[in-house]
């Protein structure tokens, strides 16, 4: 057993799973969906990073600079990502967030909590929304 596989071995495992998945459900047609927002000096002040596949948008990261929070920037880029996902044929969104991050933000936007993990890290929670 190797706890530090090289790049080729990692790629082999990824490709093997992709081939297996494709045999069962067809290609995922994964496309990145990344959006950033700038201030007046073209500095990045917010971003959403994710991708679309199998009819879903997965949000990996949604971040807004602390100096620009409570100005609807997060809402604006979330809605922009949702709209782009719909253009790509997506029917749903899923996202994870931590208890100190943005669970209330996603609830405010109509997301439904579907699971919660305790003590990740110790004393905190991880939430999964759709």
Give the location of each predicted region.
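A conserved beta-strand-loop-helix scaffold within acyl/acetyltransferase catalytic domains
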Residues: 28, 39-40, 48-57, 62-65
